[in-house]
């Protein structure tokens, strides 16, 4: 079975074509700057990279170009679009309705639309990708995989906020959590690496990229996660503030005379590492580099960043009454030995012991255990693979309906 995985953003479509027999990526790429001047397609086959400059006014045109490229004589990896057996889509928000991945039908499309106010930047764009695929590949089954679904096992004590209950009843304001597909993939893979059953382990997964979240996975089910009603809660991130006193935005709005929308943009796009560094960078690589060169302010930013992650890990060890493994993933988690070492230095009371050499060697796509043999809690690095998880779900659902 061949599955086309699509991640449709507001001005981009990322894609991978995966041959499920052997789980081999045949090609991948991104159509970027959709609806903006300078749009193009970056297409990769093995180690070859091809760039096609083309005006892409909308998502349908972008997907058309992607599909034409897949069957192109020179750049293509298949001869006919009929070789695509199914399409798997990433959808950011499934609300409370979707606890697992589902086959797309009219009812599902309507439900995704209904929860769009909870993810106004993402869901409408995800929907455009789904509708374009349904139009351009008629008769091919489409499956949606939700970022929020894995967190739907979180109990009420962890997902309800202490605000008037009527707001939950009226507006479904609660903790939803995000990065669910990544947390699900790395917790499953960590159990495989450890040679244990996922259902027997208490795992804390740390998805540390430009956006970042921690999840407590107890016996295969998520019981808490750091992102909340939106991806703004929790850790200090590239441009997002993470946790802060809810009175602060009101105070700033009053003092600076700014609107709620402006305040929201500041917390989402101008805060976090970017805000702390006074606009120097939102990229942790730049902050690390400056800190290593002796920049005291960047050293402090690293401390703030690492401290917050360690605090959440400690909290989740308490929430699960113990922890067997801690997993680092995503851009920073997979590639920053400094972050992993510093975070783990707070966790020695749990019995965490890091193997310095393994920690420094496990970067750039490598996976493995980076704790010492006598470490009570195992620490792992697992490169995330959300696309593969989406493809696996798609295959499973399509096979069930006998397509």
Curated annotation (Swiss-Prot):
Q: Where in the cell is it found?
A: Cytoplasm
Q: Where does ATP bind?
A: 14, 207-211, 283-285, 331-335
Which UniProt keywords are given for this protein, alphabetically ordered? ATP-binding, Cytoplasm, Kinase, Magnesium, Metal-binding, Nucleotide-binding, Transferase
List positions binding Mg(2+): 7, 386
* InterPro entries reported for this sequence: Ac/propionate_kinase, Aliphatic_acid_kin_short-chain, Aliphatic_acid_kinase_CS, ATPase_NBD
Per the entry, the cofactor note is: Mg(2+). Can also accept Mn(2+).
List this protein's GO terms for biological process: acetate metabolic process; acetyl-CoA biosynthetic process
Could you tell me what reaction this enzyme catalyses? Answer: acetate + ATP = acetyl phosphate + ADP
Q: Which domain of life is it from?
A: Bacteria
* GO MF entry, a single one: acetate kinase activity
In which pathway is this protein known to take part?
Answer: Metabolic intermediate biosynthesis; acetyl-CoA biosynthesis; acetyl-CoA from acetate: step 1/2
Binding of substrate, residues = 90
SUPFAM superfamilies (UniProt xref): Actin-like ATPase domain (SSF53067)
Q: What is its EC number?
A: 2.7.2.1
Q: Name one GO cellular component term.
A: cytoplasm
| Required cofactor(s) | Mg(2+); Mn(2+)
Q: Which family does it belong to?
A: Belongs to the acetokinase family.
Q: How does it assemble?
A: Homodimer.
The entry's protein name is: Acetate kinase
Organism expressing this protein natively: Thermotoga sp. (strain RQ2)
GN (gene name): ackA
């Amino acid at each position: 079975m061949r599955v086309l995985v699509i991640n449709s953003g507001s001005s981009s479509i990322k894609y991978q074509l995966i041959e499920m027999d052997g789980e081999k990526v045949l090609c991948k790429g991104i159509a970027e700057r959709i609806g903006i001047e300078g749009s193009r397609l970056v297409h990769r086959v093995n180690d070859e990279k091809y760039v096609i400059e083309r005006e892409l006014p909308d998502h349908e045109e972008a997907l058309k170009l992607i599909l034409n490229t897949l069957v192109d004589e020179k750049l293509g990896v298949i001869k006919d679009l009929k070789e695509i057996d199914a399409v798997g889509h990433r959808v950011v928000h499934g609300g409370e309705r979707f606890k697992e991945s589902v086959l797309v039908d009219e009812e599902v499309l309507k439900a995704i639309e209904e929860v769009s106010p909870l993810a106004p930047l993402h869901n409408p764009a995800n929907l455009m990708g789904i509708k374009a695929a349904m139009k351009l590949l008629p008769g091919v089954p489409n499956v949606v995989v939700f970022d929020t679904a894995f967190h739907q096992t979180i109990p009420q004590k962890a997902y309800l906020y202490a605000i008037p209950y009527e707001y939950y009843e009226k507006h479904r304001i609660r903790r939803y959590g995000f990065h669910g597909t990544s947390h699900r993939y790395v917790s499953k893979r960590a159990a495989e690496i450890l040679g244990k059953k996922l259902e027997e382990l208490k795992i804390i997964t740390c998805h540390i990229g430009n956006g970042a979240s921690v999840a407590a996975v107890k016996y295969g089910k998520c019981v808490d996660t750091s992102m909340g009603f939106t991806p703004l809660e929790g850790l200090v991130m590239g441009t997002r503030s993470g946790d802060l006193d809810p009175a602060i935005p009101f105070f700033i709005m009053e003092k600076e005379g700014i609107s709620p929308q402006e305040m929201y943009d500041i917390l989402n796009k101008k805060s976090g590492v970017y805000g702390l560094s006074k606009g120097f960078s939102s990229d942790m690589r730049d902050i690390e580099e400056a800190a290593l060169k002796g920049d005291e302010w960047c050293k402090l930013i690293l401390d703030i960043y690492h401290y917050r992650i360690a605090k959440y890990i400690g909290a989740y060890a308490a929430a699960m009454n113990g922890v067997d493994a801690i997993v680092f993933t995503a851009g920073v988690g997979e590639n920053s030995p400094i972050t992993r070492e510093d975070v783990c230095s707070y966790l020695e009371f749990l019995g965490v012991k890091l193997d310095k050499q393994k920690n420094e060697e496990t970067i750039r796509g490598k996976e493995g255990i980076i704790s010492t043999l006598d470490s009570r809690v195992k620490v792992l690095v697992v490169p995330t693979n959300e696309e593969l998880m989406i493809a696996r779900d798609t295959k499973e659902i399509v096979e069930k309906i006998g397509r």
